Amino acid sequence: MQVSVETVSNLQRRMTVQVPSERIEQEVDRRLKSLARRVKIDGFRPGKVPLKVVQQRYGAGVFQEVVGEVLQSSYQEALLQEKLEPAGSPSIEPKPLEPGKGLEYTATFDVFPKVEIADLSDVAVERPRVEVSDADVDKVIETLRRQRKEFVAVDRAAQKGDQVIVDFDGSLDGEAFEGGKGEAMPVELGEGRMLAAFEDQLNGMKPGDEKTIDVPFPEDYPAENLKGKTAQFAIKVREVKEPTLPEVDEAFAKSFGIEEGGVEKLREDVRANMEREVAQALKAKVKDQVMQALFKAHPLELPEALVKDEIERLRQQALSRFGGQVKPENFPDEVFREEAVRRVSLGLIIRELVASKGMKVDAGRVKAELEAMAAGYEDPRQVIDYYRNNRQAQSGLEAMVLEDQVVDFVVEQGKATDKPMSFDELMNPRKEGASE
């Protein structure tokens, strides 16, 4: 077999492969002889069909079958011979087959770019350092209390935090509209679940009060017939209820499934959960910095096939999140290209780092990661058994751990500094430009 390779561009290769006719002819002959021993043709005893008859009836089909298989196998052999790794499927153009001549074709494909790992000593990483305090636990307990709040009817004017039970009947230019009417609807003032203009005008109303209010709809309101319009609502307050929070006692702890240990056990569980959240957030923050640094330090020319494949994966993920309510054409390639380029680049960079540094996945870390993940579930053993009995899930976990090892390696090579911060600063970072 003869192979020649032409460099079309930095990443594109055109490989010409010539397969001797003997390879095809010998395989065709072998299959026809095997067929002659098994085939049944009228007028001939089983196993006694002349090879010439078998060739006349089945020769063309067997020939095409062999040519297809030889093309595929010779393509793989040629790649190994030339030490080429294609990125994506090739475009194959076979030359017309002539009697007595071998198979010849060209395969055009992109190859993976050569990745040269940059000097990582200047990679700056800021590692948050967080201790979960008693005050942090108190805040979470208070949030849990609010989640268990109950509303009790009061005979006074409604104020922020109250729940108002209201009837309303809306109209636009004197005409009723879809969704504009409700009875005994609970509206919690300050939650923002209703239009602000509607909610604000419930403040100060008492049980039994009635009035008609104007409510302007924003320009970006989903319903076309209401965008930018002002509707009138006749409203009547049935009840005003104020929130009451449960006491933090043994009964409160039991409401979260804690049968023994009471409030102290609840606080222990809350702290343990917060510390797991901190560990995950710390890892995510460091990883994000490392990935940004690696991407910036390794500008790559990428095979378009890989980028397109990643774009399609991202598009399918987006479509599944919308549950089929959005059409694929609403997500053009441009929406995902930047993220696809980043992901493909980082995949190639990490692959080269792992190969060049001889990294192997740490089985101990895989075990520890699995146990940490399982600890957050009601039945940790069920989670552990699932991963151990599911090869695909296990492989995904191992890939994640290996990526974590890469992050640790980069941090060790670079310049890492510790930054003390509170639990709230870590878990609820303020966006740049946020108002004081």
UniProtKB/Swiss-Prot annotation:
Primary enzyme class: isomerase
UniProt cross-references to PANTHER family, sorted A to Z: TRIGGER FACTOR CHAPERONE AND PEPTIDYL-PROLYL CIS/TRANS ISOMERASE (PTHR30560), TRIGGER FACTOR-LIKE PROTEIN TIG, CHLOROPLASTIC (PTHR30560:SF3)
Name under which the protein is recorded: Trigger factor
SUPFAM superfamilies in alphabetical order: FKBP-like, Triger factor/SurA peptide-binding domain-like, Trigger factor ribosome-binding domain
Disulphide bridges, residue numbers: none
Gene name of this polypeptide: tig
Gene3D superfamilies recorded: 3.10.50.40, Trigger factor ribosome-binding domain, Trigger factor, C-terminal domain
Family listed: Belongs to the FKBP-type PPIase family. Tig subfamily.
Gene Ontology BP, a term: cell division
Catalyses which reaction(s): [protein]-peptidylproline (omega=180) = [protein]-peptidylproline (omega=0)
Record's subcellular location: Cytoplasm
HAMAP family documented for this protein: Trigger_factor_Tig
Record InterPro entries: PPIase_dom_sf (IPR046357), PPIase_FKBP_dom (IPR001179), Trig_fac (IPR005215), Trigger_fac_C (IPR008880), Trigger_fac_C_sf (IPR037041), Trigger_fac_ribosome-bd_bac (IPR008881), Trigger_fac_ribosome-bd_sf (IPR036611), Trigger_fact/SurA_dom_sf (IPR027304)
Source organism of the structure: Thioalkalivibrio sulfidiphilus (strain HL-EbGR7)
